[in-house]
UniProtKB/Swiss-Prot annotation:
Essential for respiratory growth and required for maintenance of mtDNA. Required for cell survival in the absence of prohibitins. The gene is GEP5. It comes from the Eukaryota. InterPro entries: Gep5. GO terms for cellular component: mitochondrion. This is Genetic interactor of prohibitin 5, mitochondrial. GO terms for biological process: mitochondrial genome maintenance. The keyword Mitochondrion applies. Belongs to the GEP5 family. Pfam families: GEP5. It comes from Eremothecium gossypii (strain ATCC 10895 / CBS 109.51 / FGSC 9923 / NRRL Y-1056). The keyword Transit peptide does not apply. It is found in: Mitochondrion. Keywords: Mitochondrion.
Length: 266
């Protein structure tokens, strides 16, 4: 490793557990982990140029909420089988809303916007007629039961976040279902555009849950509590607390989400 980089990282006002991970990734060949290296180098450069703690907070988040954190199984399966699962992704046609007697209580969009958990029971994971490749037979890696379980857990995690704006890193959390708009004549928009909507929606949901708002494991939460308790200065402690200000936890055994104890320090 470049000794200059090693000196810089070793002098950062960060806990050794964080610095060791940064050094480990930066010491690998440049061709290895290119994305991870970029996401480490950019906030590091930001801190060196501007000072302040924002770059350090990004480093802490990237190390402990991404590099060191194993995603839950349902997100790993969504990532691996996204092209298959997007063929079963729930949607709502705008023209179908005209037939509803009570849009507020029956529309998927309105229920999601209002954070109503009952919408999870109304979601259907059936093969829709978009994203088809002519008459080519489709082969699936997952069974219907597996698909339903993965998608239910994905949307349960999304609902947990939707109900808690304090955990958002964005001003507005979009709804996770695909909305199929209408043409001026009242028909569905062209199929090619709908295909794009399904692809974009599954990518954005995966990115939001996997990268932008990852759920800690109970073990990862304990590690962060220990690190914060060991911080030698109040300034370092604040860096970690701010990086954890939107933390929440998934107990994989019970499949329950909860707001992290890390937020209680703030």
């Amino acid at each position: 490793m470049n000794e200059h980089i090693q000196r810089i990282v070793s002098r950062l006002p960060l806990h050794r557990a964080t610095s060791e991970v940064i050094l480990a990734y930066l010491s690998k060949q440049q061709a290895q982990y290119p994305t991870e290296r970029i996401e480490l180098v950019e906030p590091l450069n930001d801190f060196l140029r501007k000072g302040g703690h924002q770059g350090l907070q990004r480093l802490v988040f990237h190390v402990h909420f991404q590099l060191m954190l194993r995603a839950p199984e349902h997100l790993r399966l969504l990532r691996r089988h996204r092209e298959e699962l997007q063929r079963f992704w729930p949607y709502e046609r705008h023209h179908s809303l005209l037939a509803l007697s009570d849009v507020r209580s029956q529309s998927l969009r309105r229920l999601w916007e209002d954070g109503q958990e009952e919408v999870l029971q109304q979601m259907q994971y059936c093969r829709h007629h978009w994203l088809r490749e002519g008459d080519v037979p489709e082969r699936y890696a997952l069974t219907q039961a597996q698909r339903e379980e993965v998608l239910h857990r994905v949307f349960a995690q999304y609902m947990f976040l939707k109900q808690r704006p304090a955990l958002w890193s964005v001003r507005r959390l979009p709804i996770p279902v695909v909305e199929i708009g209408m043409t001026p004549l009242g028909f569905d928009i062209p199929d090619v555009r709908v295909d794009g909507l399904f692809k974009d929606k599954t990518k954005s949901v995966l990115r939001l849950l996997y990268r932008e708002h990852p759920a800690l494991t109970p073990a990862a939460e304990e590690d962060m509590l220990r690190i914060i308790a060991e911080c030698p200065t109040r300034a370092m402690r604040r860096i970690y607390l701010r990086a954890c200000r939107r933390a929440y936890v998934l107990d994989a055994d019970a499949q329950l989400f909860r707001v992290s104890r890390l937020r209680h320090f703030i």
